[in-house]
Amino acid sequence: MSPLTSATSAPNKAEILIEALPWIQQFAGTVVVVKYGGNAMVSDELRQAFTEDMVFLHHVGIKPVVVHGGGPQINSMLGKLGIESEFKGGLRVTTPEAMEVVRMVLAGQVGRELVGLINAHGPYAVGLSGEDGALLQAVRTGTVVDGVEVDLGQVGEVIGVNPGSILDLLDAGRIPVISTIAPEVGKASSVLNVNADTAAAALAVALQASRLVILTDVEGLYRNWPDKDSLISALSVKELRELLPSLASGMIPKMTACLKAVDGGVRRASVVDGRSPHSMLLEIFTTAGNGTQVFPEAGPQGEKA
């Protein structure tokens, strides 16, 4: 049940709406890129809440763009098919056999389900893969484990974005839902599995988004994990650069994505707790916000900091 349909008194409901007004005015007409993942993908309640949030953003004049991964669903399908899944340095090793499953699950299952849930509220969502219209371009990348370069197979890093198809959909009043599969630069017949956090950051920069919001399975960024009293509500890109080497491995891709987005001109980037229903709305439309927000050294006046 959403906050506005609970037993909250009428005056309190009115206060919630009035508090949201300046933020609606600030973000109306702008693009907000949302990376959807984690527990929010596997809980029916959280999936429903997320799709309601996207439709709400759409109806108050904001242009949401959804970027999704699908780690839990990929793991499940690989298990059903008896294909072993290997991780090195926290990243999935994607063999040609595994890549077929990744492609099938992201574009054919997760993306379609999300489009269907959004479209239960009206004909808004359109699903795309990073392959469509050469939306994303990627090159193969490895990782370093204990000082040794490791081959990850068909894993890539986004190096280019062709945003035209997304801009056309936004102009048509649609909500793009993007699966993070990308064609390999120089090899049109080869596709790569790209990290959804970094893909979302690249899209946010290319679309000149006002916000990047990444859903995660923790309350935000902690200065001294697992000390929950060390939760950081906001920090500058300078502070994040200094903190990045000391972060837990699971947060590094997310915070690196936030850093790249803000460095690329996105006004604000946030990680929010996707385990909490409607955390997106709290982050965008309340003064206190939700989670951890990254801002530039000298942000525009009148925005959340």
Curated annotation (Swiss-Prot):
It is found in: Cytoplasm. The record marks 35, 254 as: Transition state stabilizer. It is an enzyme of class 2 (transferase). Its EC number is 2.7.2.8. Pfam families: AA_kinase. InterPro entries: AceGlu_kinase-like_sf (IPR036393), AcgluKinase_fam (IPR004662), ArgB (IPR037528), Asp/Glu/Uridylate_kinase (IPR001048), Glu/AcGlu_kinase (IPR001057), NAGK-C (IPR041727). Substrate binds at residues 70-71, 92, 193. It catalyses: N-acetyl-L-glutamate + ATP = N-acetyl-L-glutamyl 5-phosphate + ADP. Catalyzes the ATP-dependent phosphorylation of N-acetyl-L-glutamate. This is Acetylglutamate kinase. It comes from Renibacterium salmoninarum (strain ATCC 33209 / DSM 20767 / JCM 11484 / NBRC 15589 / NCIMB 2235).
